[in-house]
Amino acid sequence: YDFTHILIAGYGLNLLQVAPLLPYYDIDPNIVQFMGTGVIDDKTFFYEPSLQGAIFPGIPETKRINLINNYMEIYEEEFLRISTLPYDLMGLINFIYTKKYKFGDVIELLNNPNKKFDGIDGNFYFKNNMIERNLDILKISNGNSYVIN
């Protein structure tokens, strides 16, 4: 091979169609490291044989399992993975409200990359008006993912 890694940027049905084709075209996952994006942090993909050993950025499910279980208990519906974003936003708004920050204080807070917030999906901070996260590298194995860094 002329490469050691391959980034699979698909999701959903697309990912489940593409990943199994790679070994068919002689891209051996035992030789080439399959990498995904954070969107493959979904149990659906953890059982796909061609994705065993694949790595992706994320945080362990244990960090958000209480929220997922509480949501299911209250609403009797499955927790949408993207719901951690507004959940963290509400936590940040509550922090600002309880500290009685003025507008200038909020701007200063959000422009300080040294100020990190503990969110459901890991620590996050603002840098140049963008959200940055400190993520782990997770590896898929036998229906689960685990931290390798």
Region annotations inferred by a language model:
Residues 1-149:
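Extracytosolic ligand-binding ectodomains
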